[in-house]
Amino acid sequence: MIRKKSISIRSKKTTYDILIGRNLLKEKHTYLQLILADKKIAIISDETVHNLQYANFLDQISDLKVDPHLFLIEPGETSKNWNVLKKVLDWLTELNFDRTDYVIAFGGGVVGDLVSLAASLFRRGINLIQVPTTLLSQVDSSVGGKTAVNNGPAKNSIGTFYHPKVVFCDTSFLRTLPERAFLAGYAEVLKMALVFDKDFYKFLIENQKLISSRDEAILLHIIDKSLELKSKVVESDETEQGDRALLNFGHTFGHALETY
């Protein structure tokens, strides 16, 4: 059995754990039961993730005896805007959530960025749990506290810094990830290695076949190593005033190409 791993983010403003493994929500039943007891729970996801993985999600939390509310957005970058954000905030208001309740972001980077921003704004901050379902969101966007929506062509121009209470990087959700999306996440892993760790980069190059086959042990290792590298940067530069800007390597041209 593949060993589960965890990493702790410990910055000046916050402390939280990133849990890495398979079927984590089921394994962490006692922990979730403790923090979610007597709380309302809102799960926000997109239609694609819902169709492919929501049954898995519900199966893993079935022992919790919770009745979560569900809000779905359309998949893709076009949902990352102020109008969709307002719909999420209006929905939470209608459900009469308060800041002691929990919002769960269940999806890739678009869902994570949007829901994190909504959580930071709703009643000046509601409890947030990240359950990223893509390799890119597991190794990068779910960790570090950046939240955002786009403002027209200006990518990520409306946002805050707001951290989750816990992040579950569950490799079981990567089974149905399309190849293109998997490669997008692997590109982020390569970038992290290029910038911060030449030995990790060498490991990636030497193990490309195993990585492309999505070998479980290899996936666990590269997610763990990438988050270890990112966590060190986030802890030392939480609001991107210095070294954290190195994580933006490639973003200038990348965002321009995505937009135009």
Predicted regions and their residues:
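Active-site segments that bind and position negatively charged phosphate/pyrophosphate groups
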Residues: K202, N207-Y260
